[in-house]
Amino acid sequence: MKSSKLNPVTTHKEFNGISGALGITIGLPTLTVLFYLLCNQTYSIHGINVDFAKIKSQLPITQDELWQLVFDKTCWSAYLAWFFILVILDYLLPGKSLNGVKLRDGTVLNYKINGLSMSSLLIVLLLARLFQSNSDSSLEYYLPELQFIYDNQLQLIIICFLFSFMLAVFVYIISFIPLAKPNGIGTKERILSINGNTGNPFYDWFIGRELNPRIGSWDIKLFCELRPGMLLWLLINLSCLHYQYHNLGYVTDSMIVVNLLQAFYIFDGVLNEEGCLTMIDITTDGFGFMLSFGDLAWVPWTYSLQARYLSIKGNEVNLGWTLSLLIVGLQALGFYIFRSANKQKSDFRQGKLPHLKSIQTKTGSKLLVEGWWGLSQHINYLGDWLIGLSWCLPTGFQTPLTYFYVIYFASLLIHRQVRDEMKCRAKYGEDWEKYEKLVPYKIIPYVY
């Protein structure tokens, strides 16, 4: 593998290297399909007892059945239309122009932030279709598009996986094509991820070789982070609500709570997309299969598990006003911790909170040790986790399956914390040891 000043060779492989990358590449898509097989109109798990015969009965037996499942023309057409219409809208819709962080070649990338116009258009189109459908159909509040999503979930899950696989191959290939114009140091090298330049094709494809793959000014990574998967998650949830209404004749309060809480989270992310420009996904990680699959398949199909579970006959949960308000309050608390902690750190970095105690490091930066950030090193992670817990609680306690998200998310946050700690320990040295004595807790104050 050729090393350069701009793109040094990656020597440390994350996720236990190639074996871990292979395990994730096979395991997570399999898990996504398994979650569907465990929770759908044909079979829904109760408790921890799995009926393997019913799972097996849902799988294709013949080659023709497998072909029809994987290459359903209608589903492929629908998904490709969804993805590329969003691409066109992302390019055409107005938005403010913001610069990202400074890159290794001294340049900065410009991003168009148009989450507000994109979200507004989606809401208007949904309401317009609902009004039109009511005029054309004898069924009240019936949307064939939402019914299509609900009826073809397994096909769409497989399509999302295959598309994310192909997208990862595409960005890996273009990472080897020289830039049309010189970069900030006068060469035509693309800026590669510090984690994705090992020289092993499979690992670099998985972790992401190029830092910011673009077609012209259109940024593939930021688009996938907040557009196709996040907005599809919203539509999947609505399809579950839609299905429950047309089968029960009403919508349960638990379904309403899940839809409202997750819709708030989705729109909060899309409307505050400028915050992504300083996140590790954008600034440090390359865009490969890990992010492609996570954004396009994992997020919409595993994060919507609670709504799908509640839509199934016999799984209805009636919370009542008290429990509903308590769960909403839990998400509000999580958001308050998450947002206020992040704002405090941002304000401190901008010099707006000079009275807060900090450690002056030898690198020239400061480590905050007061306020939210005196409670734990990643107090914002706690807020984020509480938000996820509020999504799971409306499903009751009939099966641990609907609590997978908070278990998975906890492991993800701990992995991020350990990863961040290793980098900070290497960067700050003795100053980090002083910091750990003043802020000993990692995420949860007095616990971890």
Swiss-Prot record:
GO cellular component term of the entry, any: endoplasmic reticulum membrane
Keyword Ribosomal protein assigned: no
Transmembrane segments: 18-38, 75-95, 108-128, 157-177, 251-271, 279-299, 318-338, 394-414
UniProt entry keywords in alphabetical sequence: Endoplasmic reticulum, Lipid biosynthesis, Lipid metabolism, Membrane, NADP, Oxidoreductase, Steroid biosynthesis, Steroid metabolism, Sterol biosynthesis, Sterol metabolism, Transmembrane, Transmembrane helix
EC code(s) of this entry: 1.3.1.70
Positions with a binding annotation for NADP(+): 345, 349, 368, 373, 380-381, 420, 424-428, 435
Entries under PROSITE patterns matching the protein: STEROL_REDUCT_1 (PS01017), STEROL_REDUCT_2 (PS01018)
Location relative to the cell: Endoplasmic reticulum membrane
Similarity comment: family membership: Belongs to the ERG4/ERG24 family.
Function: ERG24 reduces the C14=C15 double bond of 4,4-dimethyl-cholesta-8,14,24-trienol to produce 4,4-dimethyl-cholesta-8,24-dienol. The third module or late pathway involves the ergosterol synthesis itself through consecutive reactions that mainly occur in the endoplasmic reticulum (ER) membrane. Firstly, the squalene synthase ERG9 catalyzes the condensation of 2 farnesyl pyrophosphate moieties to form squalene, which is the precursor of all steroids.
Protein name as it appears in the record: Delta(14)-sterol reductase ERG24
Organism this protein belongs to: Candida albicans (strain SC5314 / ATCC MYA-2876) (Yeast)
